[in-house]
């Protein structure tokens, strides 16, 4: 069983895995539209974390992890708990960056618009302000944003995720007092 990470699963890998591959999925875009009251925010003052939205022609880069043989259910149970804040699972096709590896199916956690923590679209300035001010049991929301942006930049320098990098720029400007 393979699991696709496109948010904190890229940079906060606190579960065992047998193998990992960088690659992408299609027909989605990554957006900071999911609220977090259990990791990067608190009830009444949620942080914002990424989910995926359907986007014909879109693509999202990330990392696929092969769960250890014999421990798939144990690790999946842990990931179900970690991703509990409104995420459901579906299966999609993963395209490895290394084109010598054929595409294959991966499990995907996605926060849909009908879950109670879904915040939806907002002006980038408003999302940046919310990320700048939010913190929760797992730390500041800014850490989540910066770790994700740094990871994508290192893993896939050619990925110009405009939503992600625009938010990073806006939040850094706030930190610098601009």
UniProtKB/Swiss-Prot annotation:
Subunit-level organization: Monomer.
Residues annotated to bind substrate: 3-8
Domain of life: Eukaryota
Listed GO biological process terms: glutathione catabolic process
Annotated EC: 4.3.2.7
Alphabetical keyword list: Cytoplasm, Lyase
Enzyme class, spelled out: lyase
Gene Ontology cellular component list: cytoplasm; cytosol
Name of the protein in its database record: Putative glutathione-specific gamma-glutamylcyclotransferase 2
Annotated family: Belongs to the gamma-glutamylcyclotransferase family. ChaC subfamily.
Subcellular location: Cytoplasm, Cytosol
Gene name for this UniProt entry: Chac2
Catalysed reaction equations from the record: glutathione = L-cysteinylglycine + 5-oxo-L-proline
Lineage: Eukaryota, Metazoa, Chordata, Craniata, Vertebrata
Annotated active site: 83
Pfam families hit by this protein: ChaC (PF04752)
Keyword Lyase: yes
Molecular-function GO term, any one: glutathione specific gamma-glutamylcyclotransferase activity
Function: Catalyzes the cleavage of glutathione into 5-oxo-L-proline and a Cys-Gly dipeptide. Acts specifically on glutathione, but not on other gamma-glutamyl peptides.
């Amino acid at each position: 069983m393979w699991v696709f990470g496109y948010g904190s699963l890229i940079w906060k890998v606190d579960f065992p895995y047998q193998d990992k591959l960088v690659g992408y999925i299609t027909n989605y875009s990554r957006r900071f539209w999911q609220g977090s009251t259990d990791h990067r925010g608190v009830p009444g003052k949620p942080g914002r974390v990424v989910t995926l939205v359907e986007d014909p022609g879109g693509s999202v880069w990330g990392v696929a992890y092969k769960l250890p043989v014999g421990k798939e259910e144990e690790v999946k149970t842990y990931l179900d708990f970690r991703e509990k804040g409104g995420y459901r699972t579906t299966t999609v096709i993963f395209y490895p960056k290394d084109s010598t590896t054929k595409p294959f199916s991966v499990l995907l956690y996605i926060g849909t618009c009908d879950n109670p923590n879904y915040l939806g679209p907002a002006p980038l300035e408003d999302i940046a302000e919310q990320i700048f001010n939010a913190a929760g049991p797992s730390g500041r929301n800014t850490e989540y944003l910066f770790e994700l942006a740094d990871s994508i930049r290192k893993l896939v320098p050619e990925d110009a995720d405009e939503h992600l990098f625009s938010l990073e720029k806006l939040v850094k400007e706030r930190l610098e007092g601009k």
